[in-house]
Amino acid sequence: MAMFGFPHWQLKSTSTESGVVAPDEQLPFAQTAVMGVQHAVAMFGATVLMPILMGLDPNLSILMSGIGTLLFFFITGGRVPSYLGSSAAFVGVVIAATGFNGQGMNPNISIALGGIIACGLVYTVIGLVVMKIGTRWIERLMPPVVTGAVVMAIGLNLAPIAVKSASASAFDSWMAVMTVLCIGLVAVFTRGMIQRLLILVGLIVACLLYGVMTNVLGLGKAVDFTLVSHAAWFGLPHFSTPAFNGQAMMLIAPVAVILVAENLGHLKAVAGMTGRNMDPYMGRAFVGDGLATILSGSVGGSGVTTYAENIGVMAVTKVYATLVFVAAAVIAMLLGFSPKFGALIHTIPAAVIGGASIVVFGLIAVAGARIWVQNRVDLSQNGNLIMVAVILVLGAGDFALTLGGFTLGGIGTATFGAILLNALLSRRLVDVPPPEVVHQEP
């Protein structure tokens, strides 16, 4: 197979003995479509939730996730099985840059889009460098102790956003708690694909419960489906034009470093599952993700990243065929062109979104700890301990640094602080043995 060409996909059925479908194999059309639906459903929860938290049009974000996934597919030569969805790493910095209050559409989204484009540009440049010299420099710059600390800091930084959106009233607070319980029960007491879709299934159950509590029992503001009934089945989503503000760009662009670390981890996980060496395609994967982020930000969508949810689906199904993600992307694009689907998304109550956010942002924080555990990071070393302690407080407290007219927000200071502190504190002085003492007999 040529390294930079598309593979010759071999037809295979999941009914074969091994049940494993490799990236360069394909299923019959009907099975490919079904698997595509599974992946579209898997990405749905977070890809819808993240733009809502930033005040973006979720319909457009769904559409751009599909287009971005197709772009990623072509740039990687159809060899890397991944789906690109809305990244949670942008939520905190977009809210900080725009002052969004969490309700409705973001009136200042244009300057955030400029920052998202800048982030995608930085990400793309990093990908081009990786294509030339490989990823070892990234792994040295951001070892597991750094990436774990940064990921956990992101989750902690987003915590106030989740709590604020879940506590508009006493009723909303209780419904947020019920949403957390719904998701938790799905996570613990279900199995297989249902368990993998815990956010989506939990959201659906919580919305049904909210509807009973409000529309039937009258305990809160009823869910209004008027917009859904009047919305067209097909139409264009709401596009936005980016504006380039220096401070917003400086605030959002550093997210590229986080996306690199995240994507690197995801691709290593895919390599481990498929038994294929993904290193030759790592740079192109970064470029594909970066260009997809630029394209999404150019029209009003959120920044994107490879999705762990879809990696989880692959782990369950053992189907790694990249053509499945083409099917998932097409399904996402069809949903993105449906205003009725978008109107249905907007009926999700704020309390339910807040409850889901508590779980999602908490899972992000825990993912940082998982990185430490999986890589056996030694937190008994004072260098690691001090770096992690400082970075978690910087991220959780949203510590900002201002230089001239530019401000680096909490996620940015946590990211660069982790890299710099690790480089400084991981240095070891060479132990010089003490001079030998000669004891003379008296």
PLM region descriptions:
Residues 2-81, 89-105:
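N-terminal signal-anchor module of multipass membrane proteins
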Residues 10-12, 16-17, 44-47, 181-189, ...:
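Juxtamembrane interface elements at the cytosolic ends of transmembrane helices
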Residues 30-43, 172-179, 197-198, 236-266, ...:
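Hydrophobic, membrane-embedded alpha-helices of multi-pass small-molecule transporters
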Residues 56-61, 78-91, 138-147, 195-200, ...:
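Short, non-helical or kinked segments that cap or interrupt transmembrane helices
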Residues 106-216, 329-436:
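Membrane-embedded alpha-helical modules
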